[in-house]
């Protein structure tokens, strides 16, 4: 999505959002004074949004099992095992966001150590009907659905 968005920007369009199989790159604004709004889906439903985030000049990627099933291997043990239902990462690089989302899915909250020293990055982790989040993308007062409890993680 990052590469496609950059191509569009290089052609002179400064406001663009590209969705490439669920990974989204946002450049500029949706309309004057309004950032792009991207929804984070419920891990059990690809149609139900649990949280929205406002984005400019960044990318968002989610790893989970809801679309492609259990396709992710724990590299330490070589088995299909994850510690979260889904992991969403927001940051300046879409490829790294995708990789970090997969790491978080496998490592769970332990994977948040990879974010030390990455102040521009955010994460939204869901497991067992609860959400944990961190980073600047989630500093707004807006809250997710009331029946999907969340808690801010200290990183």
Residue ranges and their predicted role:
Residues 1-155:
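Mature catalytic core of soluble alpha/beta enzymes
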């Amino acid at each position: 999505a990052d590469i496609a968005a950059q191509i569009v920007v290089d052609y002179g369009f400064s406001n663009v959002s590209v969705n490439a199989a669920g990974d989204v790159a946002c450049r500029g604004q949706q309309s004057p004074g309004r950032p792009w709004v991207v929804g984070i889906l419920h891990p059990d439903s690809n149609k139900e949004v649990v949280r929205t985030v406002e984005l400019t000049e960044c990318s968002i990627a989610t790893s989970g099992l809801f679309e492609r099933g259990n396709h992710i291997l724990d590299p330490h043990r070589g088995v299909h095992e994850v510690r979260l239902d889904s992991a969403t990462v927001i940051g300046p690089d879409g490829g790294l966001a995708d990789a970090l989302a997969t790491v978080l899915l496998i490592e769970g909250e332990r994977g948040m150590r990879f974010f030390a020293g990455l102040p521009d990055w955010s994460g939204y982790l869901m497991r067992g009907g609860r959400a944990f989040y961190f980073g600047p993308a989630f500093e707004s007062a807006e809250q997710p659905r009331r029946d999907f409890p969340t808690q801010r993680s200290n990183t």
